[in-house]
Regions:
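Alpha-helix boundary/N-cap detector
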Residues: 43-47, 51, 68-82, 112-115, ...
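C-terminal beta-strand-rich structural cap/linker in extracellular carbohydrate-active enzymes
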Residues: 447, 682-687, 791-806
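Surface-exposed loop/edge segments in extracytoplasmic proteins
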Residues: 786-789
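Aromatic-lined, polymer-binding surfaces characteristic
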Residues: 91-365
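N-terminal functional module detector in eukaryotic proteins
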Residues: 54, 166, 576-578
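Gram-positive Sec-dependent secretion signals
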Residues: 1-40
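Extended polysaccharide-engagement surfaces of secreted carbohydrate-active enzymes
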Residues: 318-331, 336-773, 777, 781-784
Length: 806
């Protein structure tokens, strides 16, 4: 074609576009929307794929940041080099091999073995990319390339369309027997994640065609960046952590294949993450973040500290990369900041992510509350570059405060990227970034039946884990969390300066039928049915006072109780009534404490107990004393119940609560404090005082009084003039405040605190109805008082704040 003809063709094409007609390759003319063409034409930019690859490697590996004089980096390098060398040495290389590594032999029948194998290849590739490695020899490069090629030809890339058909039949139970070891997650997320990482790491060892060839099967198993379960014929919208994971896989696939449309779609899918779950959501639509900061996964399990952490880490990996693409994220930073402030931070104390938010992950020995918290802090540092200056400073202060709050572990041990270690070192050495003061914070997660409380003055945190018709008692799938029976039955957590209490083998060695705050039959239920009750939740007044209630029934529906918890600044009141069992062979037991005995002396009514005191006796107080006052724990019993104290040594194995964990014995000694109930003793009331000296604890023995302890109506009062209660009944209930009658006209939790001689500050919440400021008059009444200053507490807490004014 001559230059003149080319010019004519170009001019003609422009003319055709301007008139709304376009010529296709076969010469056909078709009418089109010329405005749409103009928009698409001006907006399309070619991504810099090399820059995107570099950004991904910088964020997740940080080779350029490696400093061999940094001991944490050197330690990390040596460990990775050693592991990769062993994997290379152990790799099967014979021509008749049917697997690459022992421990992952069943590549056709167990999908986790496929993912494990790809992860092993990824680990080798990660080490070989380091400038100081001795592993990047001609022989080893050939070895890893052959391993990648073998897995493509014999496993993941072997007729993927047929594999999807087989997986779909298996999922529907059309195979005999059904193979439960084939998991969609491995085909759509686990293996593709390891594979795409590996291909980017091996960029200098593979041609572009080889990389595209090896990544090609991903689009068969996971064709969409916002869908999961495609590999098993049940494609559905991805939510929460799964949406981040699948969009991340497709983002990396698009970079490898240099597919601009896939790149844009993956970013569009990622942007869908930044939404809140709707109140009307059902089934899997309930997965994700709620406006009160709750995070749900698997439809009904609180999972901020596990899947929520995975989501946050995924966001921190993707946002720096998206920033370098032509398609900027449209997500509102305010949404992400809200998740961090309301969802994550109230659950973290002294560098520890509270176990009440970690689901079945508590049964994994090496996936601790500290590793979860460390991942959050790492993610905050990564996200810094995408935030405004004030948010950057605030996040840095949060991270520095968290890392410095616990010297029992090294944060850098939990950082895999050299760039993360470099960022952390820079932050810790930055004298312009100060630590935050201790926080006074009270957070009620009514959408996931959890409560957290941080007391600034006494430096402790308290947690509460409940269950309702909306929230599971616990999760025990994939052979994990096998003894989580009662972890959602009103279990209370006390976090203090004894930072290792829950972290060091607690879940492997504690008596899981005797968890603090719970009322049980000391049983090991064989079923995991939900609590059918919906009256579970709480309300708060500022960040010091709260009233929480749970209408409780056990798994077998043989035990019921009304269980209330009242947070009153420096103390927490536990009050229960209506404890009834239809199982005549078992008496209900309320567990007051189950604490590791190491470092403590226990005093019962001021007498030290050195062995088990199995004879239940009327008891006024129990006090656990440590050399550190902040670790002290005291209990006052208001109705002189018969209390049993045991000091026992427990031996357990992580494999007993998680089939995939180690079988070696772990041993700990515990103090167990319990109250046994019967038909004539169907209630309890005790007050927890953390962090006090023994003399201060004794002086508090009359600080709380019971106003009402009826079967369905609880009210307590403290010496600061705070009244807190729960009405479990649909009937009107009343009580007196200094001769003034207060009427509760419907079910609900409430807190009332005297403001001055003419007014009371109040809060109210009913988990079974919509709580609005407009109808609060129909819920509470004091003759001669008018309700004023009505407001919903805030957008993140259910409940109504108001004042009663004379």
């Amino acid at each position: 074609m001559t230059n003149k003809m080319k010019k004519w063709q170009k001019l003609s094409t422009i003319t055709l576009l301007m008139t709304g007609v376009i010529a296709l390759n076969n010469g056909e003319f078709r009418n089109v929307d010329k405005h749409q063409i103009a928009v698409a034409d001006t907006n399309v930019q070619t991504p810099d794929y090399e820059k995107l690859k570099k950004t991904w490697l910088d964020v997740n590996y940080g080779y350029d940041q490696y400093d061999e004089n940094n001991q944490d980096m050197k330690k990390k390098f040596d460990a990775k080099e050693k592991e990769a060398k062993k994997l290379l040495d152990d790799m099967k290389t014979d021509t008749n091999r049917t697997y690459l590594w022992s421990g992952a032999e069943n590549l056709e029948t167990n999908s986790s073995h496929m993912t494990k194998t790809y992860r092993n290849i990824e680990k080798i590739a990660e080490s070989m990319q380091h400038k100081n490695t001795v592993l990047k020899t001609v022989e080893n490069k050939l070895k890893i390339k052959e391993a990648l090629d073998w897995m493509h030809k014999n496993v993941y890339g072997k007729n993927p369309s047929q594999k999807v058909e087989d997986l779909t039949k298996n999922r529907k139970g059309q195979t005999t027997p059904k193979n439960n070891s084939l998991n969609w997650w491995d085909y759509e997320i686990g293996t593709p994640r390891a594979l795409t990482n590996t291909l980017l790491l091996m960029d200098d060892m593979l041609t572009k065609d080889e990389m595209k060839n090896y990544s090609k099967p991903i689009s068969t198993y996971a064709p969409s960046s916002d869908k999961i379960l495609s590999s098993v014929g049940e494609s559905e919208d991805a939510k929460g952590g799964n949406l981040v994971d699948i969009s991340k896989v497709k983002l990396l696939e698009s970079v490898i294949e240099e597919d601009v449309d896939m790149l844009k779609k993956s970013i569009d899918s990622f942007n869908k993450v930044f939404t809140y779950v709707q109140d009307s959501a059902t089934g899997k639509g309930r997965n994700g973040f709620y406006k009160d900061g709750s995070y749900i996964d698997h439809q009904d399990v609180p999972y901020t500290g596990a899947y929520g952490v995975v989501l946050l880490e995924g966001i921190s990996q993707m946002m720096p990369m998206i920033k370098e693409s032509p398609f900027k994220t449209t997500q509102d930073n305010a949404t992400l900041s809200n998740w961090i402030d309301e969802g994550f931070m109230p659950l973290i104390y002294k560098g520890e992510m509270m176990d009440l938010s970690r689901g079945r992950a508590i049964s994994r020995e090496n996936e601790t509350s500290h590793t979860a918290s460390a991942t959050v802090m790492k993610s905050l540092l990564r996200l810094n570059d995408t935030m405004d200056d004030s948010t950057k400073t605030r996040y840095k202060q949060i991270v520095k405060t968290s890392v410095n709050s616990d010297s029992s572990y090294n944060q850098n041990n939990y950082l895999n990227s050299y760039s993360d270690i470099a960022k952390m070192k820079k932050l810790m050495n930055d004298s312009t970034i100060s630590k935050n003061d201790l926080t006074q914070q009270l957070k009620i997660y009514n959408d996931m039946d959890r409560v957290t409380y941080h007391n600034k003055d006494l430096d402790f945190a308290f947690g509460l884990s409940m269950t309702s018709k909306n929230i599971a008692r616990y999760e025990n799938i994939n052979g994990e969390n096998l003894k989580g029976w009662h972890t959602g039955a009103g279990m209370s957590y006390l976090y203090n300066s004894d930072v290792k209490h829950y972290r060091d083998n607690f879940w492997a060695t504690a008596d899981m039928t005797c968890l603090p705050g719970t009322t049980t039959l000391n049983d090991m239920p064989s079923t995991n049915t939900k609590n059918d009750k919906s009256f579970v939740g709480g309300t708060k007044l500022n960040n010091k006072y709260a009233s929480i209630g749970m209408d409780f029934e056990n798994q077998d529906k043989t035990l019921t109780a009304k269980k209330s918890y009242f947070i009153l600044n420096d103390k927490i009141v536990f009050l229960g009534t209506g404890i009834k069992s239809t199982d005549s062979s078992k008496n209900p037991v309320t567990s007051v404490e189950n604490r590791k005995a190491n470092g403590y002396k226990l005093f019962k009514d001021d007498i030290e107990i050195t062995t088990s005191d199995v004879n239940a006796q009327e008891t006024h107080s129990v006090f656990l004393e440590s050399n550190d006052t902040k670790k002290n724990i005291g209990y006052h019993f208001l109705d002189k119940p018969k209390i049993t104290v045991k000091k026992e040594s427990h031996t357990g194995k992580w494999s007993e609560i998680n089939k995939s964990q180690k079988k070696d014995d772990k041993k700990d000694e515990y103090y167990e404090v319990t109250q046994t109930h019967n038909t004539s003793d169907s209630k309890y009331t005790y007050v927890l005082y953390p962090g006090l000296s023994k003399s201060d604890f004794k002086s508090k023995n009359n600080n709380v009084s019971i106003v009402k302890q009826d079967e369905d109506f609880h009210v307590i009062k403290d010496n600061d003039g705070v009244f807190a209660g729960v009405n479990y009944s649909d009937n009107t209930k009343s009580f007196d405040i200094n001769g003034i009658t207060v009427e509760l006209k419907e079910k609900g939790m409430f807190v009332i605190k005297k403001k001055d001689d003419k007014a009371y500050k109040c809060s109210f919440y009913n988990p079974e109805t919509t709580n609005t400021a407009s109808n609060i008059e129909s819920k509470i009444f004091i003759k001669g008082y008018t309700i004023t200053n009505k407001s919903v507490i805030n957008s993140n807490d259910a409940g109504v704040n108001f004042e009663l004014t004379k």
